[in-house]
Design a protein with these regions (language model features):
Chain B
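Phosphate/diphosphate-binding loops
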Residues: 217-275, 416-418, 425-442, 477-492
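Fe-S ferredoxin-like electron-transfer domains
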Residues: 53-251, 257-261, 269
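Cofactor-/ligand-binding subdomain signature composed of acidic, glycine-rich
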Residues: 153, 161, 264-330, 372, ...
Length: 458, 566, 167
């Protein structure tokens, strides 16, 4: 039986007749949650979020209520809330829909969260390339301000908070929370060392700061609407709520689908929602959660433990769409942006594409990522242009091992995981390709271009 | 540096317990015990950057039982340690009770080999032409902690080479490991944020804002702290390999701050001056202008001879003539705040023997609030301590000059000052009988009846008293010119002849025995007891003197009112 | 600095909203770049004064963020996404096609000054890959088959009478 979406966040996305203006949002019950919640104690709201088990939707999956609980309240410094709208993880495009098609949901979620943590000021850091989104958000905030949902003495509660929409300028690393904070302070987006610069203690302007993803803040609205304990019933234990899956790559119907956590599998996503692979092709590999997560090869089997404790074995298509399930298969749900690669894909080129991305986006602050990312790019580029050596295969994996876990921020893992998973899992392709290249180099007469199979990816 | 006795906690490193001050940085703490955690970007005087990742070690804390909150003890009696899932950088780790560290595991070895490899892949093969060779942290750590071979076969990054970053600093961007020490130094210590990184990732490049230079008076400190040869001194460039140089401890004579220095020489020639650590005076910094002072050693104006009536002669003849002049009476003295404490003491003994008015000249400096004070001499306070001065000197010696003009003073014993610059006309200069003791020729020495050669601070051993009333020792780096002797020997011999007392004390140690006996604030001291970081004396006798210095690093004139003996 | 009154007003209104002046850095640079087409040395120094920081602090930022440029570009800024999802659906072919049709090399400005073509990294529209941004507009589903028509559309919009691209 085909699985259906459960649209909570995306209820009104692409709904015919749904417009961006405040009036439309209010017709659909907009700001009612704010109206009720702002009469409650902020601590109560934080408790609701804790009860809900909501995990952050920015890729790291850290429990939101726990994060809020880390805020330093003793120093007396002002608290800041930052909405991370710097959606840059390749394969991910869920936040864009919210910003461009239902901005008031984000505004309401932001004000609710700001109130809950008693923030003095809120920022929405939106990536610079979303020119339209910036204007839409500013417009929505002005509408909300005029209706007393943002700004001074919101709805007569005594609580005031303003929202500043701030544009980025083309950096993936601004999606890293401390990189974002540095960027918001007007500097190069160098992530901070932790300890001591935990944002909840020493964040923006060295004040306690919470950075939450766009979707997370929208989820907060729904948590507060239905109550934390009710929210916790949605999805599965350890991963409550819904996930917005954006699928892309080699599928017939790329697009976004909001699915209750754990209630569908990769197979459902690929066939029921994605319309299956392109005609005449089979899927060879998937990356579940934005390209930084470890790749899965079709045909892999995973020995797992089901929620009731019993053992099971999953093929890739069997994996349920929740964070614990992916974790058991040695990868991660991440930002729930699944990329499908079919059998025409040259896996070496695919990795080269990603290595070029990470080398370009490395901020350059710490040694392993700065040097390692460019080195990896150069090696894979060389292999893709016909100069591969057999020792490059282990070298790539080895360099990635030298980067992961040794860096200031998670960009190190992002650089390393694709290499650490692609190379061992597709070793046969690497060996075949390089062997052919060595042969072509040793027999330069009449040899065809053995550099690339399939579409050019780098 | 020894372990301070207060507030110690126990940490465990590679299975051994150590007592270290609580909250101390782990790298600094282990250095107290001679244990090295290799690092590049960490510097004890700058904010922590944590970007080189060379200092990765394994850290853990004792695990506590969740219910009882008690530390879990293993069957063998040791605490159960929860080791971190990833290695942590030591530079952001502060010593807390129970901290456990592992530096000799395979994980840490892999980390170090990895970081070394990464640092070297884009590094140019410049060792044969790089000034840093021999004191380069890349060389040292590659040898100690590196894998020993390279796996990099790609094209290296190309960046600007040998560009002039400032008048005294050369930048080679390919060698730069982007540790940001120089950037932090300019931001935090000098408050002149002129350096920064441009571009991104592995293409990040250190530079100055286009059109500006790294030209502040502390720019050479960036060369000192640069762990590699990216920043080098234009003065020192290509002059000498550092393994041929011998360092000797000295004191900068630029001002009364008394910056501690290291002077590097080979076979009697000085090649460079670098700061010496003293956390009570100058941390590990010094000014660029102070470093230049070594150039005065080799000057065509050096007085490297004894002379009588403009004719070079043997020391004996010059000393005899000087004695004659002094014994002739009506003597006036002009001392110098450039002289060491020992030299000033001998001068005072001379004054006691052959009495006469004593003047000093005030040499105001341009204090910069950092390491240059308002007094451009290193040892004005020595003159107070020895009794030569009771009040601050003026910038002129009009009183003394009038006495000379009137004939009340016939002979002047002048140390290191130029009478012509102090208002003595040519004529007056010619008429006065001058005994001149100094290092460089000037109009006064040209006209002097007797010229006695002095030595620069680099050529003799002695001590100065700085603005903090800290006595600090300096040691001979290079020998003086042939035929000369340290000032204390010259003065000692002169004193012996004038006083008739044949015993002289030609060494600082011997003079100190007399100093200690004569000067109350030094009672109980000895030459050795000054140590290498200096020793502060009880200056309560001069609390009322309005010394000209303002604030410097580690000096606040307002605090001097309560100076205690060291 | 020849900033329009509108831009100057915008910046003056913007600055007080931020708790610290330096925070407004990216917004100010965006505003100036939209006004003048690029960030000149003068603009960098003007911004430094406005935000009360040294010029190096501004220069560091300008060279770090790829959206800022220090020299003018063509009238139309064509940005083709090259990251995995778009590459899997033919982004490199699209880029080749656009280069050919618009007479412009990759990373260069065309000889007639009309176009600049660049690769950019993921612009978060992976479900409608391949995507191309032209100036500040996102164009979705620009497949290799559609690329020539798309190029023709760009050319048609870019008549010489059109005011220079301001984005």
């Amino acid at each position: 039986m085909p699985v259906s979406e459960r649209r909570i966040i995306y209820r009104h996305i692409d709904e015919p007749g749904y417009t961006l203006d405040l009036a439309c949002y209010q017709r659909h019950g907009g700001y009612e949650v704010l109206r009720k919640a702002i009469q409650r104690k902020p601590e109560e709201l934080v408790q609701e979020v804790k009860d809900s088990g909501l995990k952050g939707r920015g890729g790291a999956g850290f429990p939101t209520g726990v994060k809020w609980g880390f805020l330093d309240r003793k120093s007396g410094k002002p608290v800041y809330l930052i909405c991370n709208a710097d959606e840059s993880e390749p394969g991910t495009y869920k936040d864009r829909q919210i910003i461009y098609k239902d901005p008031h949901q984000l505004i309401e979620g932001t004000v609710l969260s700001a109130y809950a943590i008693q923030a003095k000021l809120a920022f929405i850091y939106i990536r610079g390339e979303m020119f339209g989104g910036f204007k839409i958000l500013e417009q929505a905030i002005e509408e909300a301000r005029a209706a007393n949902f943002v700004g001074n003495n919101i709805l007569g509660s005594g609580y005031s908070v303003d929202i500043i929409v701030h544009r980025g300028a083309g950096c993936y690393i601004c999606g890293e929370e401390t990189g974002l904070i540095e960027s918001l302070e007007g500097k190069r987006a160098y992530p901070r060392i932790k300890p001591p610069y935990f944002p909840a203690v020493l964040g923006l302007y060295q004040c306690p700061t919470i950075v939450n993803n766009v979707e997370t803040l929208c989820q907060v609205k729904h948590v507060l609407d239905m109550g934390g304990k009710e929210f916790a019933k949605i999805g599965v234990a350890g991963d409550s709520g819904t996930h917005i899956w954006g699928i892309s790559g080699h599928v017939t119907k790329p697009g976004y689908y909001e699915i209750e956590s754990g209630k569908a599998t990769v197979r459902d996503l690929l066939y029921d929602f994605g319309g299956g692979p392109p005609v005449g092709r089979t899927i060879k590999a998937i990356i579940p959660g934005g390209v930084s997560m470890k790749i899965l090869r079709m045909g892999e089997k995973f020995k797992v433990k089901l929620p009731d404790g019993s053992p099971a074995e999953w093929a890739v298509l069997d994996i349920p769409l929740d964070s614990n399930s992916f974790a058991q298969c040695g990868t991660s749900l991440g930002t729930s942006g699944m990329i499908f690669m079919d059998d025409t894909t040259d896996m070496v080129e695919a990795l080269a594409n990603l290595n070029a991305f990470y080398a370009h986006e490395s901020c350059g602050q710490c040694t392993p990522c700065r040097e390692g990312s460019l080195w990896l790019k150069k090696i894979t580029a060389r292999v893709c242009s016909g100069g591969g050596r057999m020792e490059d295969i282990d070298l790539i994996k080895n360099i990635a091992d030298q980067v992961a876990g040794r860096t200031i921020c998670a960009h190190g893992e992002a650089v390393a995981w694709p290499c650490q998973s692609n190379v061992p899992k597709f070793r046969d392709e690497w060996e075949g390709k390089i062997r052919a290249q060595i042969h072509a180099r040793e027999h330069p007469d009449g040899a065809t271009d053995h550099a690339r199979t399939g579409l050019r990816l780098v | 540096m020894s372990v301070p006795a207060t507030n110690l906690v126990t940490i465990n490193v590679d299975g051994r317990d150590y007592q270290v001050p609580v909250g101390m940085n782990l790298i600094d703490a282990l250095e107290l015990f001679g244990l090295e955690i290799p690092h590049y970007c960490y510097h004890p005087k700058l904010t922590v950057a944590g970007n080189c990742r060379m200092c990765l070690v394994e850290t853990g804390m004792p695990m506590k039982d969740r219910q009882t909150n008690q530390i879990i003890i293993e069957p063998d009696g040791r605490m159960k340690i929860g080791w971190g899932p990833k290695p942590a950088v030591a530079c952001t780790t502060n010593c807390t009770p129970g901290l456990h560290v592992r530096t000799n595991t395979q994980v840490v070895k892999d980390c170090r080999e990895g970081v070394m490899e990464f640092l070297l892949i884009n590094h140019p093969l410049d060792c044969p032409i790089c000034d840093q060779a021999g004191e380069c942290k890349l060389q040292e750590f590659a040898t100690d902690y590196g894998r020993g071979y390279s796996r990099f076969v790609e094209e290296k990054n190309v960046k600007p080479k040998r560009t002039l970053l400032g008048p005294r600093v050369m930048l080679d961007d390919e060698r730069c490991i982007l540790c940001s020490r120089c950037v932090r130094f300019c931001d935090e210590i000098v408050k002149d944020p002129v350096l920064g990184f441009i571009d991104r990732g592995s293409y990040s490049t250190l530079t100055c804002y286009p059109g500006r230079e790294l030209d502040n008076n502390y720019s050479l400190n960036t060369v000192d702290i640069c762990p590699v040869g990216a920043l080098t001194s234009t003065d020192f460039r290509f002059k000498m390999r550092v393994w041929f140089l011998k360092p000797a401890p000295s004191i900068c004579t630029e001002s009364s701050v008394g910056v501690n220095t290291e002077v590097w020489s080979r076979e009697g020639k000085i090649y460079r001056v670098t700061p010496r650590d003293n956390n009570a005076v100058n941390d590990c910094w010094m000014s660029d202008s102070g470093r230049e002072l070594y150039k005065s050693v080799e000057s065509p104006l050096r007085i490297d001879f004894f002379a009588v009536d403009n004719g070079k002669c043997a020391a004996d003849k010059a000393l005899a003539r000087a004695t004659e002049l002094l014994k002739g009476g009506s003597v006036g003295y002009i001392g110098s705040a450039q002289s060491s404490l020992e030299e000033q003491f001998l001068l005072w003994l001379l004054v006691k023997t052959e009495a006469g008015p004593v003047s000093f000249v005030n040499h105001p400096g341009k204090g910069d609030g950092l390491l240059i004070s308002n007094d451009a001499t290193p040892n004005l306070r020595g003159a107070f301590l020895t009794g030569l001065l009771k009040e601050l000197p003026k910038t002129n010696i009009d009183d003394l000059r009038r006495k000379v003009e009137s004939g009340a003073i016939k002979t002047l014993f002048v140390v290191h000052e130029d009478l012509a610059a102090l208002g003595f006309s040519d004529d007056l200069l010619r008429r006065t009988q001058v005994i001149y003791l100094g290092t460089h020729a000037n109009l006064t020495s040209d006209y002097a009846q007797v010229v006695l050669p002095g030595l620069t601070v680099f050529e003799k051993t002695g001590s100065f008293v700085n603005q903090q009333w800290r006595v600090q020792r300096f040691f001979q780096v290079v020998p003086g010119p042939a035929g000369t002797a340290p000032d204390i020997q010259v003065l000692g011999q002169l004193l012996a002849r004038v006083s008739g007392n044949t015993s002289t004390a030609p060494t600082p140690e011997a003079i100190w025995q007399q100093l200690v006996a004569s000067l109350a604030p030094l009672s109980g001291w000895s030459w050795e007891s000054i140590g290498m970081q200096g020793r502060v004396l009880d200056a309560s006798a001069w609390v009322h003197v309005p010394f000209p210095e303002g604030k410097s690093k580690h000096f606040d004139p307002a605090a001097v009112t309560a100076v205690k003996a060291g | 600095m020849n900033l329009s009154a509108k831009t100057t007003q915008y910046i003056d209104n913007l600055l007080p909203r931020y708790p610290q002046k330096q925070s407004a850095m990216l917004m100010v640079l965006h505003a100036i770049q939209e006004d003048q087409g690029f960030l000149s040395k003068e603009a960098i120094e003007w911004t430094a004064q406005k935000l009360e920081v040294g010029p190096m602090a501004v220069y560091e930022v300008v060279t770090f963020y790829p959206m800022f440029r220090q020299a003018p570009i063509g009238r139309r800024h064509v940005k083709v996404c090259r990251t995995l999802s778009c590459a899997l659906r033919g982004a490199y072919k699209v880029c080749d096609s656009l280069q050919h049709e618009l007479g412009c090399g990759l990373g260069e400005t065309s000889a007639d000054g009309n176009y600049t073509i660049e690769f950019v990294e993921c612009v978060a529209a992976c479900g409608s890959a391949p995507v191309v941004m032209v100036d500040d507009k996102l164009h979705e589903n620009i497949t290799p088959e559609k690329a020539p028509d798309f190029a023709a559309k760009i050319k048609k919009e870019t008549t010489p009478l059109l005011p220079p691209s301001r984005h």
